[in-house]
Amino acid sequence: MRGVDVIKENLKHLPSRPGVYRMFGEAGEVLYVGKARDLKARVSNYTRMGGHTQRIARMISLTRAMEFVVTETETEALLLEASLVKSLKPRFNVLLRDDKSFPYILIRRNHEAPQIKKYRGSKQDEGDYFGPFANAGAVMRTLDTLQKAFLLRTCEDSVYSARTRPCMLHQIKRCAAPCVGLVSKEDYTALADEAADFLRGKAGELQKRLASEMEAASEAMEFETAARLRDRIRAIAHVRSTQDVNPDGIEEADVFAIAMDGGVSCVQVFFIRAGQNWGASAHFPRHEKDQTAPEILAAFLVQFYDKRPPPKLILVSEPPDQADLIEEALALKAGRRIELRRPERGTKRDLLTQAERNASEALSRKLAESASQERLLTEVQKVFDLAEAPQRIEVYDNSHIQGTNAVGGMIVAGPEGFRKQAYRKFNIKDTEITPGDDYGMMREVMRRRFARAMKEKVAGNVSDWPDLVLIDGGLGQLNATLETLAELGLTPDDVTLVSIAKGVDRNAGREQFFRPGKAPFKLPENAPVLYYLQRLRDEAHRWAIGAHRQKRAAEAARSPLDEIEGIGPTRKKALLHHFGSARGVSRAKVADLMEVDGVNEALAIRIYGHFNSG
């Protein structure tokens, strides 16, 4: 059975209750996930002979099976639908493509000297979290100025505990140097508290207090102290001016504006926290051309907040479909009232107008870039004799220093440009690879990548299968990759491979391109497609080097406690919290160590012996 017949057969067993339904295609892939207040009534709509959009008609014709989950309420169905859409990525659903976590600023409190840092992920560390910020750039600009204003450390605990003299940041007046006791614990904690107050929106009060202290220091002829306070006041004023403080006191809100053109949409998001605009981000959700702005915005909002806490106020440029249901679902997740509004006048309307303008401008840029990108991909098709313009290009490179901390990197590009959410890092695990063996590293990367891709393909997910694979290297890298793919049962017909080798003088513009069974060739130095391929290769190189540096930094930052058997993350955290640093642990006696939760006498003796064996 297929299409409408499959749907009619499933209707026989459906209850008239809330729930979620899934439609599957020929290969078992999920075509669509939908929710309904009444499953039977909703699904029966698909059996009508006419009145469907092209998208829905095509989806019905491709349907080969269906599955259903009954829920207690329509609100629960909406939340489940959003979660399934994000995880399954069905072809016919609106999909939030760039669904990465947003960064926060963390003032970490589980140390004698609180650290300020950029933070992503689940909130596991003890401390004060401020955000979300729209992007890493907004966080880093704020952190940079906060360092000038509050002199908080940014170094990791392992670096802090190893300091014997102030670092460069203290010399340029960015850190109070608590590591070597140049500031008392009480004064440093006060600085951390002031930074937290600033990020909570109390900057005005803080500026007044510091100004009063500066005047008092000046009158007392303590000019160095007055100068330091003056610099801090200036830094705070700079942050406030660049963060677009809201004059009418919108304390906490997210602002969403949607722009559409030619079947493409852009959703612009502003984050307002503590009365400040903490940045903007533009999103380009995947959807069919016939879908409307209210429909797209509804799906976007529920997916956006699937793993994020919503603020009290959400402003939208136009009401999404089922706005009341979305409001109810978000309130259920947050455990408090959430207001979803489309203001018509006042400051909130002005804020939305600004977001709408940003959305339109971002969409115009995106469409211009897409047109240029399509032309370049058509040129790539011609250069490499492809059947059609590639929609997914994967580019690979390795990075290491004499074989240490070796990492492989994969970047992905397509009609929409670089797909950074699809980038991957491969830590080289094979201990039999000779240090520095680039061919061996590439073999491992390709084996892992395509073994997984083949499993996904069998399961019906072909969206991640590359149309073109580019490798940074010459004929040797190409042959190593071909051998690895052959071991997996893949041929050049299954995976289109090209390796890029720089010329003998390694100058850009003299690259040679190698393909299986064909003579190498060069492209004209001024060809736009050559510049594009160079950009792809350079982006893969940048990504691989960045991954290598991260791995090397993590290795360097390892605590001495990591080397002691019996100390995992929980005990390590307890020891550092109790003694302040690894150096403090190293100086502790057995009896002192036993005072820490989770440390018995045997472990205390082992820890003491580790640091005092010499």
Curated annotation (Swiss-Prot):
Interacts with UvrB in an incision complex. InterPro entries: GIY-YIG_endonuc (IPR000305), GIY-YIG_endonuc_sf (IPR035901), GIY-YIG_UvrC_Cho (IPR047296), Hlx-hairpin-Hlx_DNA-bd_motif (IPR003583), RuvA_2-like (IPR010994), UVR_dom (IPR001943), UVR_dom_sf (IPR036876), UvrABC_protein_C (IPR050066). Belongs to the UvrC family. It is found in: Cytoplasm. One of its GO terms (molecular function) is excinuclease ABC activity. SMART domains: GIYc (SM00465), HhH1 (SM00278). Keywords: Cytoplasm, DNA damage, DNA excision, DNA repair, Excision nuclease, SOS response. This is UvrABC system protein C. The UvrABC repair system catalyzes the recognition and processing of DNA lesions. UvrC both incises the 5' and 3' sides of the lesion. The N-terminal half is responsible for the 3' incision and the C-terminal half is responsible for the 5' incision. GO terms for cellular component: cytoplasm; excinuclease repair complex. The keyword rRNA processing does not apply. It comes from the Bacteria. GO terms for biological process: nucleotide-excision repair; SOS response. Residues 16-94 form the GIY-YIG domain. Residues 204-239 form the UVR domain. It comes from Hyphomonas neptunium (strain ATCC 15444).
